[in-house]
Design a protein with these regions (language model features):
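Small-molecule-sensing regulatory modules
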Residues: 45, 49-284
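A conserved helix-loop-strand patch within extracytoplasmic ligand-binding domains
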Residues: 1-45, 129
Length: 284
């Protein structure tokens, strides 16, 4: 997992408008239930419009940004210039060289990003560890050469943060269509040991209720019996970080469940609340 790109949501609006300066009744396009729920809570006066299509097609819905659809023409009959703004992911726009269309990079404290937003994951098949490692890199290479090569680009802090975010999502039995946000980060904690912090939100689709939690876990210092061995100390720290990240994500999810997040309409699948309460029916 390479280093994370900008995890924030991006407002792309006409005339340089921001979330705070969009006029009452402004039409804002997004295809994300998470963004819809938070926008309804933040700016209930806005008109939210469900949109689909690639990045260029979505930008073409905003006056002044239609030119970015020149090399990817919109489908016949697709609206153009009918919205005041659209919300996309900063990371995607940055990677496409379209950062200049962003009129506001929305603070995660204002709009919590999706779990894993801005992060990329590289996967290989188990059998490729031997086949590619030997056939492509070096016919005489030992099994696991490709895996070792990929580890060189792995950013531990990003990997740990995304592990925590996805642990929360998994515990809530939710997917990308649920109005759930989570952002974690690794910081310097006490006595030189790292701390993992997480801010997360779960909302009703209509924005009528937004649950928000911030929590953290402080790791212990590296044990004295391995502190003198850099390799052993690093291995201990890595193992401890991932275990703590998983536990933090589950802990925050459990807090949401205790608050009734699984009972919010259109939010997450019914999960075991541990109190004998019935689970709501799964949404269609």
């Amino acid at each position: 997992m390479p280093a994370r790109a900008d995890l924030r949501d991006a407002l792309c609006a006409r005339d340089g408008l921001t979330l705070a300066t969009l006029p009452e009744g402004a039409r804002v396009g997004t295809g994300s239930p998470r963004r819809v729920a938070q926008l309804k809570a933040l700016r209930p006066d806005l008109e939210l419009v469900d949109i689909r299509g690639n990045v260029q097609t979505r930008l073409a819905r905003v006056p002044g940004l239609e030119q970015h659809d020149d090399h990817a023409p919109a489908a016949a009959g697709s609206p153009r210039g009918d919205l005041d703004a659209v919300i996309l992911a900063c990371a995607g726009l940055d990677r496409l060289g379209l950062d200049h269309v962003i009129t506001e990079r929305i603070d995660p404290e204002v709009m919590v990003p999706a779990p894993g937003q801005g992060a990329l994951a590289v996967e290989i098949r188990a059998e490729d560890e031997s086949f590619l490692g030997r056939a492509l890199l070096d016919p005489e290479a030992p099994v696991g050469r490709l895996h070792a090569a990929l580890e060189l680009v792995d950013d531990r802090d990003t990997h740990v943060a995304v592990t925590a975010e996805r642990a929360l999502l998994r515990r809530l039995e939710a997917g990308c269509a649920a109005p759930i946000g989570a952002v974690a980060r690794v910081t310097d904690g006490e006595a030189g040991a790292p701390r993992i912090e997480m801010t997360a939100m779960v909302a009703a689709l209509d924005g009528s209720r937004v649950l928000r939690r911030t929590s953290s876990v402080q790791l212990d210092p590296v044990p004295a019996d391995v502190v003198g061995d850099p390799a052993a100390a690093d291995e201990w720290l890595e193992d401890t970080l991932f275990v703590a990240a998983e536990a933090l994500g589950v802990h925050v999810a459990e807090q949401f469940v205790a608050e009734g997040a699984d009972l919010l309409p259109g939010t997450v699948r019914g999960v075991d609340r541990g109190d004998g309460a019935p689970r709501p029916d799964d949404p269609a």
